[in-house]
Amino acid sequence: MGKLPMKEAALVYLDRSGGLQKFMDDCKYYNDSKQSYAVYRFSILINPCDVVELDAELGNHILHHPLKAAQVFQSVCFVAVKTLSLIGKLQTETQINIVLKLTHLPSLPSYSLDLCEFPLNYASQRFYMMQGIVIAMTTVTKYTQGARFLCSDEVCPFSKGFQYIRVHVPGATESATVRNDFLCRLCSSSLQEDRKFRVLGDKQIIEIITTKVLHAFQGDPKNQPFRFQSLSVFLRDELVNKMKIGNEYKIIGIPVCVKTSQTALCVEANSITPYTAKVPSGISDNFRCLLSLTSSSCWRFTAILANVFASHIVPLGTYNLLKLCLLMSLVQTRDCSSERENCLDILVITSDTLLVDRLLNFSMNLVSRGIRHPVCTEVFPTVSRDKYGTGAVSIQAGSALLARGGVCFIGDLTSHKKDKLEQLQSALESRSVTVFIPGKKFGDDFDQQMTFPIQCSFWSFVDMDSSSRRNVQKASTLIGQMDCSLIPANLAEAFGLLVNCKESSPCHPLLPTVQHTLKKAVDPKGPPYLASKQFTTEDFEKLLAFAKNLNVEFSLEAERMIHGYYLASRRIRTDSIHGSKLSANALKYLVSLSEAHARLNLRNKVLREDVLIAALLFEISLTLKYGATAFCVAPNALFPFELYDEDYLEQRDLYLTQCQQQLQHFIATCGPGTAVLSSDE
């Protein structure tokens, strides 16, 4: 088939798809403009499947020879402009710059570019689809979108007019569009650029990694060496600032080879689509059966979950308070496309850092964005000079932005320097981080600031019983208060939950831990308990993935109770000298805890029973920080008995019912008028 039938097919497609009408509207904009143009840029949306059905050869050109396909549409559009007199100032076909924007690519392996496979096909100059997470991006700079050249010989007919128009094509460098060694094809004289007709566009470079290499940031249990490489993606014009650090995208683009100090594979992006993870349709049969058996109580299902969770890491029934907090934090994570930001940050006070480290690392890996912060890198974004010599500033993600929508586990809090802890405190309080870009250092006249939202939960622990720290601990004068002098008080307050897992706490029974360790040493691969077979790690992954996507709303009773407890607690923990001890985010933490418990129960409505669990957890945390108050909560209030059978669950329900009555009495006694609340409160 020659070019004429393809041009006819292109015209038919434009007419059927509505592209012709959009093209005419764009032409009207150019024609009505008082500005003179050397290059007229048109973006045409292409559905490859529709084109292939209409004309197979044109579809093949679009998929495998996009530059030639653009020339076909360029010719069609030029004829349309001249025939319909759409742009009066247009003189030559080369003045039309056609950009084909693909909606998708066929779901075939040959159109997918896997960043983990070798070799990568970058010589074919055709479209591929790749998927990755943004780990770095540059500031926006300019590039030459199009330029007009004239022959330097005034006698030559090409010293006037628009015969020599150069436009950017995918994969081309700046020197391919504009330089001083072009020659006239008529008289061989040198060409000179007419600078007043130069067209500039926006350019941005981002770096992505494939999702498969996230295990490098999740703590490899086998301690095997690994290596991964990022891929640079060039965004131009309307695609600039369409991608956010930490988000995952599907990218259609053309791979090209760029030579800097060393040869690097890059991609010229054509279209970008945010990636949305599939939500599981349900939970495992074992959990469904357990949910049915415990439906008579609002507290039993989550109690059993915490009891059997991570049974191959810690003994069955131990660390239940911490495990419940971890599960609630995990269900408050969400996909990057979600607007929900109710994160739950956890700080663990422990004397067994090895076991707690293993438990937190295992829990973190149950969500897709669980990032263990490597010691050699930065938690928050950093800036450096762009390696491609564009003059732009490159902003590297850091662990916190990479964990977007998930969990950032930063290890032992005391291993971080003072300035980093101050930065962490600021991020926890404001849920954002600001990057300062000094103008002098990067060749700019002005300093810049860029602010990024922090959309992950932070987990950390503090070893309070190490030999180097025992001597500096001070005895507490308040009931229930724990000495946290090793970390700044404001930083401890910034964490939503403070969990005590020291030897003196109910979380830390010694004998079961010894028995569990011996059992694992004798049979490392075997499940240590029957519950480990019934509720596997995969079952918990599926449960969490389903629960975190539930949309929950507060019942009126739950809303009144949570506001009542907040006002009463704020009132009783306020003095005339220091003011209120509750942070500005206290109410947000209570709401998040209540929602988390409802989600973990697989419910769409937050009940008073959920608010009770939230209030108990929050009060235990406040007691560790400031000591007990009138609403005195025992450290083991959520798990007062060992959960051996149904009778113990019944006793726990009775105990929590008594706690609920105490909470209501506390609200009635200390809460100043909680029956009617304004929307602001």
From Swiss-Prot:
GO biological process: double-strand break repair involved in meiotic recombination; double-strand break repair via break-induced replication; late meiotic recombination nodule assembly; meiotic recombination nodule assembly; oogenesis; spermatogenesis; synaptonemal complex assembly
Record GO cellular component, one term: nucleus
Phylogenetic classification of the source organism: Eukaryota, Metazoa, Chordata, Craniata, Vertebrata
Record InterPro entries: MCM, MCM_lid, NA-bd_OB-fold, P-loop_NTPase
The organism of origin for this protein: Rattus norvegicus
The name this protein goes by in its record: Minichromosome maintenance domain-containing protein 2
Domain MCM: residue ranges: 533-621
GO molecular function: ATP binding; DNA binding
Designated gene of the protein: Mcmdc2
Function: Plays an important role in meiotic recombination and associated DNA double-strand break repair.
Keyword list, A-Z: DNA damage, DNA repair, Meiosis, Phosphoprotein
Modified residues (Phosphoserine): 292
Pfam families for the chain: MCM_lid
